[in-house]
Design a protein with these regions (language model features):
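Short alpha-helical elements
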Residues: 1-177
Length: 177
């Protein structure tokens, strides 16, 4: 599992895992082969993390998303590993090609749930799925990208209060804290 996570940074994989952690991974593969194997390992790794490594729901939760770039924008047309799955998306840092990692964490920083979607999926979309917010109640804090009246009402019915900062052009709304 460590080599797969470390593959997100090629320099770390080549310098740390292949050289200094070789005794822990005697059959370590080349970086190019590891990138090819990522697609096969993605689903089992996701299931393992969901079953074993998630934290406990304590009270206040935070939701956010981050891009997982699979290649540079100039190489989209020759990319093969996630062809047909990865999509072009936009984040605060500009355009990217890949996936979005949506995370819900508690105040201790423990991951409570996560979802990986194609890059073109709206940040609010995973919160609409019952499986993403199941076993949660209380307050959920998000950034301005999660503002949606329909989403707020849907989560409120499920016992989740979505808290976001208001945009500059919005009228103030009363919320109980």
């Amino acid at each position: 599992m460590i080599p797969v996570i470390a593959a997100l940074n090629q320099h770390f994989y080549l310098e740390k895992v292949c050289k200094h952690l070789r005794h822990l991974f005697p059959k370590v593969v080349s970086y190019n082969r590891l990138v090819e194997l990522e697609r096969e390992v993605a689903i089992p790794l996701t299931l393992f993390i969901k079953k074993v490594l998630l934290g406990k729901c304590t009270g206040i939760r935070f939701v956010d998303s981050t891009p997982l770039r699979v290649c540079r924008n100039q190489r989209i047309h020759i990319h093969k590993v996630f062809k047909g799955i990865a999509q072009r998306g936009k984040c605060s840092m500009g355009w990217f090609f890949g996936f979005k990692l949506h995370l819900i964490c508690n105040e201790k920083g423990e991951i409570l749930n996560f979802m990986i979607t194609p890059g073109d999926v709206d940040d609010r979309k995973p919160l609409e799925y019952k499986t993403f917010v199941e076993f949660m109640c209380g307050k959920l804090v998000g950034d301005k990208g999660y503002i949606s009246k329909n989403l707020f009402q849907r989560l409120f019915v499920d016992g989740i209060q979505l808290i976001t900062k208001l945009k500059s052009n919005m009228k103030g709304a009363l919320m109980s804290v």
